[in-house]
Amino acid sequence: MLRMRVRPPSAIPVFLIFVLLPFVLTSKPITPHYGPGHITSDWCGFGDSRSDCGNQHTPKSLDIPQELCPKFSSRTGSSMFISMHWNNDSDFNAFGYSNCGVEKVFYEGVNFSPYRNYTCYQEGSFGWVSNKVGFYSKLYSMASTSRCIKLINLDPPTNFTNYRNGTCTGNGGTAKMPDNPQLVIFNSVVKVSTQFVLPSSSDGFSCTKHLVPFCYIDGGCFEMSGVCYPFGYYYQSPSFYHAFYTNGTAGLHRYICDYLEMKPGVYNATTFGKFLIYPTKSYCMDTMNYTVPVQAVQSIWSENRQSDDAIGQACKSPYCIFYNKTKPYLAPNGADENHGDEEVRQMMQGLLVNSSCVSPQGSTPLALYSSEMIYTPNYGSCPQYYKLFETSSDENVDVTSSAYFVATWVLLVLVIILIFILISFCLSSY
């Protein structure tokens, strides 16, 4: 009679199963640090008093770690929007913003908000919020393919005669007309054309593109001395044309701006009649051969001042990552109620170290990937985050770090292989 010898299963595979399985089942994700971050040291920031170490109330006035001030181009009371449109005077604190970095963090904008209650004509302060959204949307988009940004002055035209500069009618006639673009009103209706030059470089900075404002006043013709004059003009070059014209019945006049990306070159600014604008400043930018989304942090006042959501509206995927505050602006340990917000200070801590990933969920120093792999095309969609599921919004509800994700699945595969080995071993014993 044949006897079947059954060998007992090896204790080693069973031991491995019981040792590895708990790791598979209990591995946990690493929570990213919510706020802006950077992958390399080649980064820069743009700000206001909350990142200006020249402020007399530093460090209590800061929302960033004090040691990061050299990384930021900042001025108390200013913003990139204010500096685009106005010169430095008693009404507006303009600043020559200039900075370079592959990665960019923007934390400014609050100094021009509905709290200022500015209106030039009848657009109201919220009409200027729309202009602000348009400006930052174009700025962020252009900056995502640029390393350097510099505000530059343009040479004024010299061939004008018999004209006066335009003025605002809002705020009882006390509102200061934007200096950029400059509006001029001629004494007579004549077709006038003047040239302006967008340079290809400025003080050692390469300018392969310029952010230029084109502003106009809508609402039909303008009544002057019993005559209603059409309102219109255009910018033109052999490869560029942008215009506005209206000759309808005079109505509600609003000051509206388009923000244009223009290449270096010589352009004509030409009037259709009595009014003309020409640019006096531009944001000069170079061009990178890849795209790195910029990062913008919500810039608001405390609850005692009226703010807007222009930064959030302007900062959109794929060219910008927006970090929204979850609480009102609160500064119990700051210089005043509008400087030293605790939440933003915590958000900005992520800028103190290089991270391996920057995403809408935040940044983390843990990753299995190099910076070269992240810049193109994964900056903003981090390789070390595994998307568990998508939602109808732009952000993922949950993410898991790849270190744990990869380890979990490797261990799971090993356990499955060991189970098959054990089964095969048992079957072969019969």
From Swiss-Prot:
GO terms classed as biological process: fusion of virus membrane with host plasma membrane
Q: Quick one: where's region Receptor binding?
A: 134-274
The residues the entry assigns to the signal sequence are: 1-27
EC main class here is hydrolase
Compartment(s): Virion membrane; Host cell membrane
List the record's Gene Ontology CC terms alphabetically: host cell plasma membrane; membrane; viral envelope; virion membrane
* Region Esterase domain first part: start-end pairs: 16-133
Q: Which residues cross the membrane?
A: 405-425
Predominant location: virion
* SUPFAM superfamilies found in the cross-reference section: SGNH hydrolase, Viral protein domain
Q: Where is the active site?
A: S49 (nucleophile), D336 (charge relay system), H339 (charge relay system)
GO molecular function: any one?
hydrolase activity, acting on ester bonds
The catalysed reaction is: N-acetyl-9-O-acetylneuraminate + H2O = N-acetylneuraminate + acetate + H(+); N-acetyl-4-O-acetylneuraminate + H2O = N-acetylneuraminate + acetate + H(+)
Show which residues sit on the Intravirion side of the membrane. Answer: 426-430
Q: What does this protein do?
A: Structural protein that makes short spikes at the surface of the virus. Contains receptor binding and receptor-destroying activities. Mediates de-O-acetylation of N-acetyl-9-O-acetylneuraminic acid, which is probably the receptor determinant recognized by the virus on the surface of erythrocytes and susceptible cells. This receptor-destroying activity is important for virus release as it probably helps preventing self-aggregation and ensures the efficient spread of the progeny virus from cell to cell.
Family that this chain belongs to? Belongs to the influenza type C/coronaviruses hemagglutinin-esterase family.
- What protein does this entry describe? Hemagglutinin-esterase
What species does this protein belong to?
Answer: Porcine torovirus (strain P10) (PoTV)
Q: Which gene encodes it?
A: HE
